């Protein structure tokens, strides 16, 4: 398990919830499930965004299906993940791209 990041504070010492962007990937969204490469062994949160609606699955060897979580088009979401896992994506309607950013 990775060590939590130190919380950033404002001028009055109040915590500001913030994460630093790390490595990123772009995965094609199509009619077959596609996987990202394995996330870093320290990554526990990812930021995802797609230009099309799509289904997402997470795990060691995930396959996204039409019963998985739906990410609406042009929406940013953050998910907790297991270090070293992968993200799988499947189109909901049309083809596009899923952007994944490992947050630290």
Can you name each region flagged by the protein language model?
Residues 43-49:
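Short hydrophobic/aromatic-rich beta-strand motifs
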Residues 49-67:
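Short, surface-exposed beta-strand/strand-loop-strand elements in extracellular ectodomains
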């Amino acid at each position: 398990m990775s060590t939590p990041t130190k919380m950033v504070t404002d001028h009055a010492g109040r915590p500001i919830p913030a994460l630093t962007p790390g490595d990123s990937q772009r995965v094609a969204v199509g009619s077959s499930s596609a996987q990202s490469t394995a996330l870093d062994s320290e990554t526990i949160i990812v930021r995802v965004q797609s230009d099309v609606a799509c289904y997402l699955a997470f795990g060691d060897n995930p396959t996204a299906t039409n019963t998985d979580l739906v990410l609406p088009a042009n929406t940013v979401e953050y998910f907790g993940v297991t270090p070293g896992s992968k993200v799988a994506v499947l189109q909901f309607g049309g083809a596009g791209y899923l952007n994944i950013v490992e947050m630290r």
